[in-house]
């Protein structure tokens, strides 16, 4: 998978480690397949999520980042072939959806200028469709609709954006969204029982874990098969590279 990690995360080449971590968290949550309801878009989200995971893997490691800056190659050296991508990606996928990460990001993101900008971008993208806005903006729920409408109405009043007909309140659509959200919550609960996670989730809640933290266990399990597909592709690509004759230290010193 040939990508530009800086472009994928949306950061400049001189971005600090902290900025890269923040960009990674935002992109990972934004493209997480389990926050997408449309099945076709879910496939696209998985592809983007994989790119984000790889980009962060390069830029979060000083040696890989330095090597990429010099050569434009994602793989560091021949020795990097032995890197345990499976273990690293497993930890990465789990870290993205941990309750702590979600709560931390949500606390800093909601009501921020960054969220307001994302709301307005989603408004423009959907031509005023609240369905699109709630689908695009991270960490939001049905209950955020009135708050988002206030943000958008203020921007319209200030002349920053134009008003679309689709933005007009529609009680019928609001009820439909509420029913859809209730149905998805029920499906998630049924899936947790099917996967044998329901008892684990109950124990987490009894132990004082938040709903988001408990649900993260379910999300991680659903991501397992996706993760291993990515790992297989990476290992296949790297194993082909490893068949090439390795240069001796002497020959490398001449280059």
Swiss-Prot record:
Disulfide bonds: none
Gene Ontology molecular functions: heat shock protein binding; Hsp70 protein binding
Domain J: start-end pairs: 4-72
InterPro entries, sorted: DnaJ_domain, HTH_DNAJC9, J_dom_sf, J_domain-containing_protein
Protein name per UniProt: Uncharacterized J domain-containing protein SPAC1071.09c
Glycoprotein recorded as keyword: no
Residues annotated as signal peptide: none
The keyword Nucleus belongs to this UniProt entry's keyword annotation: yes
UniProt main location, coarse: nucleus
Membership in a protein family: Belongs to the DnaJ family.
PANTHER family: DNAJ HOMOLOG SUBFAMILY C MEMBER 9 (PTHR44144:SF1)
Protein's cellular compartments: Nucleus, Nucleolus
Keyword terms of this UniProt record: Chaperone, Nucleus
Pfam family, one: DnaJ
Stretches for region Disordered: 167-215, 230-255
Ranges of biased composition (kind: Basic residues): 167-178, 243-255
GO cellular component, one term: nucleolus
